[in-house]
């Protein structure tokens, strides 16, 4: 390794020397050896993205940003799409372990399923970045939202609207996604941390929607029938909560029920805020996550440390979008990223 | 065309199954021909004709008058010719027409024949004839290429050179009314002046209007056997003699050009695979697997080369009744059937027997209608 | 013409058309097509995915196969029973839940967790089994309903325990071993799978429960009539399915330690695809563990290959769906048409040129006469299929019948008869051994010996298997005629190795050397094939020199002489060629002559067809068997030849009403006895000028 490095430096030195010789005639600037190394190291590397599924804003957004950098820096970027199937995802991950790419970007369906496999992957020398949904295993890096924080912000917003005397009642409903996913497990923790300090807030319903807007719609429909005086609702993901919102609108309680949701901050979510479907939209900003992800990918690929040696994480900042601050800067479309 | 048929049509037919119409429906086999009264045994008995003076029949080179005596009959020779008689027809006025192989048509009465030698037709293959009410004689020529006795060769060569011509009532002038037929082998006049012709190799009955140049129109197709001579049935129907059965093996050989050509070139016609007028005792005759005698019994449904079959059609040309002599019988090779005075007679040329049929059902066009 | 004939002959000698049909008769052919599909898939994957073949791929595949394959086995068992189990996916999810709750939440030992998991599967399977087996509900609807029910249960329980499951990891080395461990590089879970699969294979293919399962699946009513407890068998199939699914779920839990809302969703389709693709017939009764494994590997390779190709997930599912449809379609067509295809391609005619028959005059020795027209009939209507006739020293007449008996007609008038022995198959050739035992070739069975008291014993029913034969030719299919050499060795002919007794005539259409001459030595008890590639070897008779024998090659219309001993040992020459008919049995006659029974007469049209194999093949394919061209076997003829092979007499049944197709003769004291395999009578006729004291027994073994 050392020898290799020395040779490499030697080579760079030689090139630099010839550069000086040829440059003596006219000043053409200096070659930046770090730039060359940066590019050379990244070139030809292999990065694989294992999303929950392709075909929705978050994964498409990240993929678009990651692909851009891969193109720019000339490393290969592939996607293994398990189409919402945990089983297919584990199979893909398992075959990736034997395939040995340089880096895996994993999007966990729940905090357990990939946990051991990710550890195995790192043991096999593959660096692993987890994106937005963590697993129990901490890997080289995690980039994404701090779900606890989202939960706290959402709960705080609902508490502000539904504390005794502020809303029609103190009843709050929670629509979760998949009970074993990080977004559920940690967000609920955040929510209850706040709610536990406000014992007057009543949680009248807490059901899993499996990220399915239709299911979310029917759940909220039922909740509203049982509790026509519902004051607030916390949804776990904007895509599913379009269903929640439409149930609220259908019941004509758009102004009564305060709906908080979170998501990647894409244009559709923003429009829903504008339309008054979502009252508060906590955005974890996909383009930003994508850029951080890119930085992490580049950092890890350049790093000489072996997989799993150092574990870092970065919880990216959140933006609270309401009708008041919906603007171009906070929202994105896929075309913007491409 | 169904999808299946269409798909099959896309591929060469080399392996497609070959089927022949089953003896079914109105042709459901029975033993009525086998059990019919056997009036007379006369070798090579062939064509029956009803005249005012009684029933005539041809056999070999001679012409006989049939004199029934209850359950038997005797044959009285009334004329002899130099070559085998190929057809006999009789007009309402008692005039006869006799086709003699290679010796033209003899018209008139025994002893007072007027010979007509139709030009441009094959005079040795005059297979059938019938007089119209105006005295015109219609004659079938089975094939332009072969004499009547070589009918099998014509079949194997895929012959379709048969003709029908008309002989004027007075001047004896000849006029072809139809050609390109596949062995016309029987003719009868229908009530409206049209002719019914049996086209043996196409297993069908066609009608021809002698007054127009219209193409023949099939009225009865896909017969289960090769049709032979026709005669009018009382009540406007039609009697049909069918001289040999159709078999899958024959149809196969007819499609297998290479095999058939070599068979025709190297083997005696008697031993060919193909229809026959009678079963043969010779050990060198071809056999189908189903015709093997099992436990001393030859199954009646065995695929024999010869068969006896007579059918009666109503005035619309729809078969109404059939008489059979099956593989285990011997009244095979029926070449002629006619109705006289309420009785129906048939000739089994294969066995040389004159039969009187027990006619049954009555549907408006029957023998006793 | 000659050149093209020569080409034709070469083409049929060197192109083994028949192999295709023979391969199709093999029962393993059902597995071959899925296996070929598997090989093709692997090759394609290797071609388009670089680095597909690696140790990692295989250990990865092995791990996946252990779970997926177990569920495939479960479904295979149910499909074999004639049902279907759509609830495997939901059942799987419930069992995973049971395992994880036991391990992660309750912290139970692995053994207890396994028991709990299996119990869950058992209960689920039992519910299916009772509903379908005992309450006779439709399998499809029932398992569709239980699919929904089990899934609903899962959906109710799962959210309540989800956090608890993901919140803790059990500390259990056994659990980890099952999940990740490997033994000499082989994943432990795969070893578990292999053990279960082998066990299931043995149970399904070798043990009674497996046979019963197939019987029930194949023909429920027949199985019931055969005394099988259909209800119980069906019920147990579902229980087995539940337990196997639970086992798979246990392995899954150990591997992932977690579950998601989607666990098991869509599994039934993937597994169904695998099972059908592997060749398990949805109709029930047909399939094996091998099928399930092949299908599973195929589907796993396909899915993981597609994922590695970075195909969008929905496209993967679309492709799997299309594959399932194709497999189901193929299965339906294959089951329906395999027999048909076999019928079409099995018959494989070859080129056989017989010498031109000479035309014969009235004075020819072969001229047709009617000397057999008025035979004395024996046993008319009492015997069916007397292929061979033989007389003992007391003048009693023996013959075999197609009812599987040997009948004895008692001298002197042969009016009375009795069943001498019951064999079970149709006895063909008969001959007396020097000790008075009656030896017989039994169609479909072998060579048997009947002691004078009627006791039956097997002599031999197999010979050495030839190396290059596709069909198993070690068993005797159609032993035809036999004779005994002076030293007691039994020489017998086997007419064809390609057809059963009932289809012997089809062999005529092939005209190939499908038969052989076999020798059994009672001293060593060994049976060896002496000559093979003979064209329907039929009658066998030992010559008077005690060193050679004559045997007939029926479709070749010739008699051969073969020396099995003495200075000419091993020599084979034509004794009599270009016979007018097809020789069947050969027997010694008085005055040093031999009798040849002619089974049928040659016809020129058939001779011509024998030179046109393609014509015969088309005939076999295009027209019904009853219509096939055949030698003329409706006439009877017997030839008498001198020791040097000259035809000296011919006896005919001109009309063929009493004795068509004579298959054997036996001269005895001035009479000639006639048998026919498709006849219902035996005939005897006086031979003018024959020695009235001559008997075959005396000629062979000397006078008593």
Give short role names for the model-derived ranges.
Chain A
Residues 103-123, 191, 205, 209-271:
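Hydrophobic alpha-helical
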Residues 79-81, 135-160, 174-175, 206, ...:
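Short beta-strand elements at the ligand-binding edges of bilobed clamshell
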Residues 34, 89, 143-170, 186, ...:
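Hydrophobic alpha-helical segments within soluble ligand-binding/sensing domains
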Residues 111-149, 168-171, 265-274, 278-279, ...:
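Flexible loop/hinge segments that line or gate small-molecule binding clefts
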Residues 58-73, 150-157, 182-201, 215, ...:
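Short, solvent-exposed amphipathic alpha-helices that sit
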Residues 28-65, 69, 73, 77-91, ...:
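Extracytoplasmic "Venus flytrap"
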Residues 71-83, 171-174, 192-213:
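Short beta-strand elements in bilobed, periplasmic/extracellular small-molecule ligand-binding domains
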Residues 26-45, 175, 179, 183, ...:
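Hinge/cleft segment of the Venus flytrap/periplasmic-binding protein
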